[in-house]
Amino acid sequence: MNSKYQLPKDGGLVKDFAPKDIIHRYERMATRVFESEYYGVQYVADIICRMVHAHAENASVRDIYEELPPFVLGLATGRTPLGLYRELVKRYQAGEISFKNVAVYSLDEFYPMCGTDHQSRNYRIHDQFLKHVDILPENVHIPDGTISEQEV
C-alpha cells in the first residue's frame, strides 16, 4: 500500500509537518491524577451519584416528558471499573443511590459467546455490579453475543 502520508519513524504526528489536507486537532483533555485508586473511585462515584440525583430532581425534564426518562450510564468491563462498581454497590446498600431510573449500556461483547459464560462481558457486569443494585432488567443494554452471523 502506497500512501502519501507518513509518520515519523519514532511514531507520533509532528504538528508543523502534518499535511494540510488531513483533518486533525490537538485537544487538551482535562485530566485528574489521584493519590490512589480509592480517591479516584470516590471522586467518580460522587459525580455519578450527584448526576443521578440531579436527573431525578430536574423539573425541566419532568415538564417535557410525561414519564421521566432514565439517566443513561455507560459501563465498561475489565479490572479498571471494579473499584467503582464496588463503591456504587456500597452506596446503594447504604441507601445513598437508587438505580431504578438508570439505564446502563455496555459497548461491546465477545462473539460468539453466551451471556452466562464467565468470560462474557454481560456476565461480568451482572456479577460485579448489576445483580447487587435495584436496576430494572429492561434498562440493561448489553450486546447479544449469541446472535447469528446473518444478524450481525
Annotate each language-model stretch with its function:
Residues 35, 75, 79, 144:
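Conserved residues at beta->alpha junctions
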Residues 37, 41, 45, 81, ...:
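Generic structural signal for well-ordered, non-membrane alpha-helical segments
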Residues 4-7, 11-28, 97-152:
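Ligand-binding beta-strand-loop-alpha-helix segment within the catalytic cores
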Residues 48-53, 82-93, 126-129:
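Short, well-ordered amphipathic alpha-helices
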Residues 58-94:
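Glycine-rich N-terminal segment of FAD-binding domains in flavoprotein oxidoreductases
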Residues 1-73:
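N-terminal glycine-/serine-/threonine-rich phosphate-binding loop
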